[in-house]
Amino acid sequence: VPDYRLDKLNEMYNPKKLVPTTFEFTDIAGLVKGASKGEGLGNKFLSHIREVDAIVEVVRCFEDGEITHVEGKIDPIRDIEIINTELILADLEIVENRISKIEKKAETTKDKAAVLELTALRKSKEALESGKALRSVEYTEDELLCISGFNFITLKKIIYAANVNDEDAIAGSNEFTKLVQEYADKEGSKVIVMCAKLESELSDYEDEERKAFMEDLGLNASGLDQLIKATYDLLGLKTFFTSGEDECRAWTFKDGMKAPECAGIIHTDFQKGFIKAEIMSYEDLATLGSEKAVQEAGKLRLEGKEYIMKDGDICYFRFNVTK
C-alpha cells in the first residue's frame, strides 16, 4: 500500500528495513452467462469469490478493433449486468435451499434463532428476485450476523475498475466511464478509471523513473495506487506505524480497533500481555522533526486498553507475558 508517511519515516530514521503494509488482489477468471449454473468456470469462480472481502469488477471501456469483445460490441453496462445477474442467481440458490431447510422449524417451534434467520433470508430472497444485490438491503445487526456465515457474494462491497485507453486514462473519463459512473452512483459504489496497458508499462519502471514518466503524462497517481486507496477505504482499513533504527513498518488495522487488538496484529503476546501504548501521531512527528521534540512538546502519550487507534499513530507497545 503506497504511503508517503512511511517514506518520510524512512528519511527520518534511516532504518535497516522498511516494510509497507499490504493486502492481496486475487485475479479470478472472468464470468460468463450461465456461471451460476456451472457453465464456464462457474462453480469454481463462485467458490473463490465467496472468500474475498470485497470485489473489483474490471469493465472494458475502450474501443479497439484488434481486441474482439466476446459479446461483439462495447457496452459496459451490459457487461456489468451479466456479471451481477450471475452473482445474484448464485446467492438466490443458496437462499432458497436454506429457506427450505429451516422454514418448517422456524414456523412450528418458534425457535428465536431460526425465526430470525428465516426473516433475514426471506428479506434476502425478495431483494434477489427483484434483481437487487444484498448490499442494497437494510438488515438489522442481528440479521447480518445470522447470515454472515453464508458468504453471500452480493453482500460484499464492490468497486468498478473502468479499463480505458491511455489517452482516456489521462483525461480521466470517456463516454463509457460516464455510463459506469451513473450505474455505480445508483448503488453507492465507486469507480476507478485506469488503463491496464499503461499500468503494465508503469510496473516495469523503477520508482524515480515511474514518477518522472507519470509527471510527463500529467498523472498525479497511477490507476493501481488509486485502486489500492479506494479498496483500503472501502474496507474501513487504517494504518499505524512502528518505527526505529532497525525497522520502520506500516500495519493495517480495522477502523475502531483498540490498542491491545492492534498490538496483537504484531504478535499475539503483545495483546495478551498488553500494559500500555506509547503513541505519537505522524503529523506531530513530521511537524516537530524528532521523537525528542515530540516528547518535549508533550505530544507523546501513554494510552491504555480502551484507547481506539487512529490512522497515522506511531506506536511502541509495552507488554509483559508471564509464563
Language-model regions: role of each:
Residues 54-57, 62-90, 94-97, 155, ...:
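Switch/coupling subdomain of P-loop NTPase systems
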Residues 101-310, 315, 320-321:
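C-terminal-of-GTPase-core extension/linker across diverse P-loop GTPases
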Residues 25, 49, 92, 96-99, ...:
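Hydrophobic faces of stable alpha-helices that mediate helix-helix packing
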Residues 12, 55-58, 86, 98, ...:
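Amphipathic, soluble alpha-helical interaction motifs
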Residues 9, 27, 45, 56, ...:
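Residue-level signature of catalytic and energy-coupling elements of molecular machines
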Residues 4-57, 61-81, 140-150, 173-176:
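Switch II of P-loop NTPase G domains
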Residues 3-6, 30-32, 60-66, 73-75, ...:
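Conserved nucleotide-binding/hydrolysis micro-motifs of P-loop NTPases
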